[in-house]
Swiss-Prot record:
Listed name of the protein: Defensin-like protein 45
A GO cellular component annotation in the UniProt record: extracellular region
Bilayer-spanning residue ranges: none
InterPro entries tied to this protein: Defensin-like_dom
């Protein structure tokens, strides 16, 4: 019986110590996604449209690209990761 009480006390002390610990072991960096990763370098025009924009973006290593005409993009080819 003494061994059971001792082991139960020991387990409870370990649980108490773990719950009072200030270490944040599961923390990790949060990396932004979405528009912040977009690249809008080229200007779109009547001769440089969505097709050429997407092709240039893919050749630059992005997954896709499209011409955006609304502010704040102001008719630019934006490449997406």
């Amino acid at each position: 019986m003494a061994i059971t009480k001792t082991s139960a006390t020991f387990v409870l002390l370990i649980i108490l110590a773990a719950s009072l610990s200030n270490f944040n072991v599961l923390a990790s960096d949060i990396k932004p996604t979405g528009r912040i990763d977009n690249q809008c370098k080229r200007m779109c025009s009547a001769t440089y449209g969505n097709g050429k924009c997407a092709a240039d973006c893919r050749s630059d290593g992005f997954s896709s690209g499209q011409c955006f005409t609304s502010p704040p993009f102001d008719n630019r080819c934006c490449c997406n990761n």
